[in-house]
């Protein structure tokens, strides 16, 4: 009788441990979609020629911790509009992958580039407001942006 219970409980215990081992590392870990939003979305503001915009935003969004992120782009459009890019013109990503999409229309963005000579922990950025098409990599269910690949000028 005790052996029968052990034979039933052992696989159940193994299954529970496997599930916990699989779920635990993802607890508290930022998803790729959330990371994209943190690093690239700034729907609440319009592009700013304020020279301190990038310095403030890069710090605020935790992109200057441990190192200075060399380049970053903020998109100043509603999140739903950026998510809809995942269903627009399919293009090849810079890395050769086939999950990138180009926006049908220009979007308001701000490019942030590390200035020459800037070193961690004193990360200093050049702020460049622009209006360009964006290219994002999408994945998941729901299918959403997970990587900002590039911005391109209107070809018309």
Curated annotation (Swiss-Prot):
**What are the disulfide bonds?**
54-112, 68-123, 86-138, 93-100
Subcellular locations according to the entry: Secreted
This enzyme's EC code(s): 4.6.1.18
Q: Which GO terms describe its molecular function?
A: lyase activity; nucleic acid binding; ribonuclease A activity; RNA nuclease activity
Spell out the InterPro entries in the cross-references.
RNaseA, RNaseA-like_dom_sf, RNaseA_AS, RNaseA_domain
**Basic and acidic residues: bias regions:** 33-43
Q: What is its main location?
A: secreted
Q: Does the keyword Nucleotide-binding apply?
A: no
Give the superkingdom in one word.
Answer: Eukaryota
What SMART domains does the annotation carry? RNAse_Pc
- Give the region (Disordered) as residue ranges: 33-52
Enzyme class, first EC level, given as a word: lyase
Q: Which residues form the active site?
A: 40, 147
A GO cellular component term found in this entry reads: extracellular region
Q: Which SUPFAM superfamilies match?
A: RNase A-like
Query: What residues bind substrate, as annotated?
Result: 35, 38, 69-73, 94, 113
Assigned keywords, A-Z:
Disulfide bond, Endonuclease, Glycoprotein, Hydrolase, Lyase, Nuclease, Secreted, Signal
Protein's job: Endonuclease that catalyzes the cleavage of RNA on the 3' side of pyrimidine nucleotides. Acts on single-stranded and double-stranded RNA.
Subunit? Monomer. Interacts with and forms tight 1:1 complexes with RNH1. Dimerization of two such complexes may occur. Interaction with RNH1 inhibits this protein.
Describe the family membership recorded for this protein in Swiss-Prot or TrEMBL. Belongs to the pancreatic ribonuclease family.
**Name of the protein in its database record:** Ribonuclease pancreatic
Which organism is the protein's source?
Gorilla gorilla gorilla (Western lowland gorilla)
Gene (name only): RNASE1
